[in-house]
Amino acid sequence: MNQLTNLSSAEISAQHEQDAKDLTRILPASKKVYIEGSRPDIQVPMREISLTDTPTGLGGEHNPPIMVYDTSGVYTDPNVQIDLNKGLPSVRQKWIEERNDTDVLSGLTSKFGQERLKDIRTADIRFAHIQNPRRAKAGKNVTQMHYAKQGIITPEMEYIAIRENQRQREAVDMRQHPGQNFGAKNLKEITPEFVRQEVAEGRAIIPANINHPELEPMIIGRNFLVKINANIGNSALGSSIDEEVAKMTWATRWGADTIMDLSTGKNIHETREWIIRNSPVPIGTVPIYQALEKVDGVAENLTWEIFKDTLIEQAEQGVDYFTIHAGVLLRYVPLTANRLTGIVSRGGSIMAQWCLAHHEENFLYTHFDEICEIMKAYDVSFSLGDGLRPGCIQDANDEAQFSELKTLGELTHRAWEHDVQVMIEGPGHVPMHMIKENMDLQLEVCKEAPFYTLGPLTTDIAPGYDHITSAIGAAMIGWYGTAMLCYVTPKEHLGLPNKKDVKDGIITYKIAAHAADLAKGHPGAQVRDNALSKARFEFRWDDQFNLSLDPDTARSMHDETLPKEAHKSAHFCSMCGPKFCSMKITQNVRDYANNLTNSDSEVEEGLKAMKEVYQEQGQKLYHKV
């Protein structure tokens, strides 16, 4: 494993060498900058995109750089030496220690974790620098929600406020349409106190396990920028640890705000350790997947004890949020009988099968308060799973789906009583005209806890293009108030996504999230659009490429027809050519208008002269030629 993940090792194949370069390559005209907070160790990363000046012929003005949100971590910082074998540098360790409410344990307390650590068969693939985990001191609660309710502004909250603002005060063109926010708050400036209030009220979460100090704090809530999640993970059919780590770093490079490791294949424990130690963003999991592996895939053999040990195992590794399918109740399972596609959630189907086999209530529901006790000891956030989500548009918004959603609302209140952070997972497959009903009901029954949706996919006829069918729904539900969108790749329903699929899914969902921010009228959301539009009008081609979500693709598409360097300053593109470019024509019209110096009296004299000509020609509109 060490040879596979060492970026400089001669053992790495040529493709892996290229992958390593791709992960650390700085995007064109960009540089990593850090904004300092109220203390020297609050250093908030952003990406600064430099722009060229407007040509003299078009006014000759300076265009200041544009600041954008950056999820890539230190991988794009040339001053940091990347060594995957050692993991990322800690961002939050000092903050956690200063609070003096955690203990460093003498070792892992999870039975399974202890077994894996002693298993000589995993020695070669095990992360070499495993630290003893932290846990809350007896009687202490270490969640960001608990601190927020106590009126405490943590360094994480200040970090997030700086990050969300993206230095908007320095932006030149803040023109923006007002948008329709459906009750969300559009503050011109996010303050640390506002972050605290939103977390205290449960309207936002800061997923940040005390055992993931490498994490760069971020927030999920409808009054903040819309976030996106990327799913990765191995399966029984393939993928290695280094491939999954590469997928994670690749996804964060292009804009994934969180990552879910949905591994169901070999070495789940070790794969997750490598991912967490090298991830600058929160990591989520579905613990029931690994619990099922521990009973050889037989759902009926699952027990609360096995699941509890899995929660502790993953919490001690540093998982930041758990998807828990506690809303799949025994009485709801029959409601899916007449569905076209039944239960499509893996976690939902596992728990439904267990309930039917034992004819007992879902043990995730009956042990929910015990789960909360574990969550608050490590500050793991809930992502309450939608195990009965619709798997096709025909099943959208049915009784099974909405019954579960109402139960998730009940569980949200129970989690909040423990000061545990909660977000709610949503569908699924929903046609456009039925999407808003989902958002409205979620806001009502879950009291504005953040909504986290998979799409939704708006049609079922496009396998291979479901990143598009879902992005349509994602943009809409993001506009209505969803806080985080789970990406869908072109491989959805077809296979395990590769590196290209991951990037395609990320870019597609960055578009959907940004479109939602624009539609909501989120302050500053239009700054980048304005800058790119200005560059386009002024034929600053390089600036257009560099301001785009995917500069590499934009440049390569332009170069397919206009490859020469001289074409980067041409006042046309291959779509219209030099004579029919609307923007060039508009510039000519502007130049003509600016050169008109006629006074009002001159205009009147001209009109009088033309009137006389008209009368001399017999006052006829048309004349024979």
UniProtKB/Swiss-Prot annotation:
The keyword S-adenosyl-L-methionine applies. [4Fe-4S] cluster binds at residues 573, 576, 581. It comes from Acinetobacter baumannii (strain ATCC 17978 / DSM 105126 / CIP 53.77 / LMG 1025 / NCDC KC755 / 5377). It is an enzyme of class 4 (lyase). Binds 1 [4Fe-4S] cluster per subunit. The cluster is coordinated with 3 cysteines and an exchangeable S-adenosyl-L-methionine. Zn(2+) binds at residues 429, 493. Substrate binds at residues 231, 260, 289, 325, 345-347, 386-389, 425, 452. One of its GO terms (biological process) is thiamine diphosphate biosynthetic process. GO terms for cellular component: cytosol. This is Phosphomethylpyrimidine synthase. Keywords: 4Fe-4S, Iron, Iron-sulfur, Lyase, Metal-binding, S-adenosyl-L-methionine, Thiamine biosynthesis, Zinc. GO terms for molecular function: 4 iron, 4 sulfur cluster binding; carbon-carbon lyase activity; zinc ion binding. Its cofactor is [4Fe-4S] cluster. Homodimer. The keyword Iron-sulfur applies. HAMAP family: ThiC. InterPro entries: ThiC (IPR037509), ThiC-associated_dom (IPR025747), ThiC/Bza_core_dom (IPR038521), ThiC/BzaA/B (IPR002817).
